């Protein structure tokens, strides 16, 4: 009985995180190509239609950290925070690019025409809800390292 309840809870939890796919759009590809011309760091928070408490904490705490610590960089465009709903057709290209199928957090650095991405999803799920200050501090340190 306990195994059935545990299994059901696990399945519902994973479903709530939004195991969705999206459709293709050339508009997103054009926008991505234009954005790659400027040196910058992007914080990309991906999500589906349904989000669990941890998924929502990732967005909330990531956005709070970025807005509190990087106001000047947000204004001058050297840092960008994007929320991307992977259940929308126009976001399929970017979701495919980073192989995202559920809630995820990436840091992407564009420097001299080259792109490097760091997947922080495991770190975010481990800390955003249960240790938000640790999450914010770690995210801030990672972003500072990429902005240098």
Question: Residue ranges of each PLM-predicted region?
Answer:
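Local sequence-structure signature of Cys/Sec-based thiol-disulfide redox active-site neighborhoods
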Residues: 36-68
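Sec-dependent signal peptide recognition
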Residues: 2-8, 22
């Amino acid at each position: 009985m306990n195994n059935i309840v545990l299994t059901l809870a696990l399945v519902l939890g994973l479903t709530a995180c939004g195991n969705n796919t999206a459709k293709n759009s050339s508009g997103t590809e054009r926008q991505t190509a234009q954005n790659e011309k400027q040196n910058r760091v992007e914080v990309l928070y991906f999500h589906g239609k349904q989000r669990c408490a941890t998924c929502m904490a990732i967005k909330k705490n990531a956005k709070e950290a970025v807005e509190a610590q990087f106001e000047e960089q947000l204004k001058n465009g050297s840092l960008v925070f994007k929320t991307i709903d992977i259940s929308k057709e126009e976001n399929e290209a970017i979701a495919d690019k980073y192989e995202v199928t559920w809630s995820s957090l990436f840091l992407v650095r564009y420097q001299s025409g080259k792109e490097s991405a760091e997947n922080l999803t495991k770190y975010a799920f481990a800390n955003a809800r249960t240790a938000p200050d640790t999450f914010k501090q770690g995210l801030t340190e990672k972003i500072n390292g990429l902005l240098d």
